[in-house]
């Protein structure tokens, strides 16, 4: 019995080990097949992504293309036996869909395919408050000089003139370049986020009709009357500010013609006149004040109840003029002037009244955004070196970072249509392989 038992035991072990070996070989074969399948499926997916990137590159060259963009069959390389077809079509007035479809013949002769869809917006309405400073063009006689500092993004459709070492804390873009290349005399500017030339022109609106329409609907429209607007923050509570409107006789309580509750839900946040507008005071609320055909005058500091850098503030102010926005030459403005708001001059500039004859007035501090047709003068300087202020104001422009959100802006503040296409969504099909 002992010999038979030993024989049976040996045969049992041999059968068991043989069965295990057979299964291990089968599993190894399946693993190899599954890996090959996964690799081919991944290639199909990557082929669709490659097609999408080719399509985007073609749109970058010509954003007006519609319909079939490309149909390519590959006969070598990683995507051998692969094909992708890319087309772009309009699916609604504001959205285009670019679709990339791949086809890959696998080693088993089966064909797999994947789809990538990229949704793009051909029109982007953006607000000018995205810029800390912007000008439509720059005068060759007006310079950024040593002592000037801008926090935030800067752009000009023209040529940027620099003398000395002004500091630009955000990226600078200049469609027309610089008066002298950075690093060559007298342009020793400090660009903290770099600079770029030859960028696309950003168009200004043809008029301020949107503000006129808003003022005539649920805002305050004063027609052809000059107005003086004094902002009053009310109490220490939030959102209880007022705007007091005076007639042409000026700052006297007897001349008040309107009291505007800025928290009134029926008020859309716009106060406007086609004539000159004079502004001062402290804002609690959301407001745009505009002179739609003339100039605006800053009579004293124009502040928010809570500083724009306070994370709890929701105050936001727009100061919009067809012509100049003028820092008045008066006692209140002769020792610094501070403005919390977004300033927009459609045809002219932000300037200091009598900038070349008034004394040295310290700093013009703007916390917000400045957009002007052409750069205006707020002071004069001796080019040195070093460049030294001789009259008017030195510029201290700080960007209100809240304005970097395109959806956050003063009521009915001017905007522009951005060029090109913006990717708003990217969708990829995902296949779950059926491994065996």
Please give the residue ranges for each predicted region.
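Compact functional segments
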Residues: 358-436
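General beta-strand recognition
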Residues: 97-99, 297, 351
């Amino acid at each position: 019995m002992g010999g038979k038992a030993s024989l049976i035991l040996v045969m049992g072990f041999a059968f068991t080990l043989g069965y295990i070996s057979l299964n291990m070989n089968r599993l190894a074969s399946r693993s190899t097949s599954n890996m090959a399948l996964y690799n081919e499926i991944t290639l199909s997916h990557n082929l669709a992504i490659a097609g999408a990137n080719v399509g985007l590159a073609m749109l970058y060259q010509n954003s007006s293309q519609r319909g079939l963009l490309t149909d390519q069959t590959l006969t070598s390389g990683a995507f051998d036996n692969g094909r992708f077809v890319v087309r772009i079509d309009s699916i609604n007035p504001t959205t285009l869909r670019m679709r990339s479809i791949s086809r890959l013949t696998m080693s088993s002769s089966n064909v797999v395919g994947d789809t990538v869809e990229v949704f793009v917006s051909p029109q982007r309405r953006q607000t000018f408050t995205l810029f800390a400073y912007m000008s439509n063009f720059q005068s060759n006689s007006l310079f950024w000089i040593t002592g000037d500092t801008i926090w935030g993004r800067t752009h000009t459709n023209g040529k940027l003139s620099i003398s000395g070492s002004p500091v630009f804390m955000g990226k600078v873009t200049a469609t027309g370049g610089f008066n002298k290349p950075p690093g060559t005399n007298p342009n020793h500017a400090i660009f903290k986020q770099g600079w770029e030339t030859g960028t696309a022109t950003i168009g200004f609106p043809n008029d301020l009709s949107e503000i006129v329409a808003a003022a005539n609907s649920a805002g305050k429209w004063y027609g052809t009357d000059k107005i003086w607007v004094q902002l009053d923050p009310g109490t220490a509570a939030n959102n209880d500010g007022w705007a007091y409107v005076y007639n042409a006789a000026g700052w006297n309580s007897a001349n008040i013609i309107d009291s505007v509750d800025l928290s009134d839900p029926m008020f859309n946040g716009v106060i406007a006149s086609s004539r000159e507008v004079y502004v001062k005071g402290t804002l609690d609320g959301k407001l745009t004040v505009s002179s739609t055909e003339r100039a605006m005058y800053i009579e004293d500091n124009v502040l928010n109840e809570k500083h724009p850098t306070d994370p709890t503030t929701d105050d936001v102010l727009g100061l919009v003029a067809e012509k100049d926005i003028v820092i008045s030459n008066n006692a209140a403005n002769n020792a610094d002037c501070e403005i919390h708001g977004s300033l927009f001059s459609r045809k002219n500039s932000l300037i200091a009244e009598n900038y070349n004859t008034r004394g040295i007035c310290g700093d013009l501090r703007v916390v917000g955004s400045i957009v002007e047709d052409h750069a205006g003068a707020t002071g004069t300087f001796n080019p040195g070196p070093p460049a030294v202020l001789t009259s008017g104001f030195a510029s201290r422009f700080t960007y209100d970072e809240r304005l970097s959100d395109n959806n956050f802006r003063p009521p009915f503040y001017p905007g522009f249509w951005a060029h090109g296409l913006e990717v708003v969504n990217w969708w990829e099909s995902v296949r779950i392989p059926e491994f065996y």
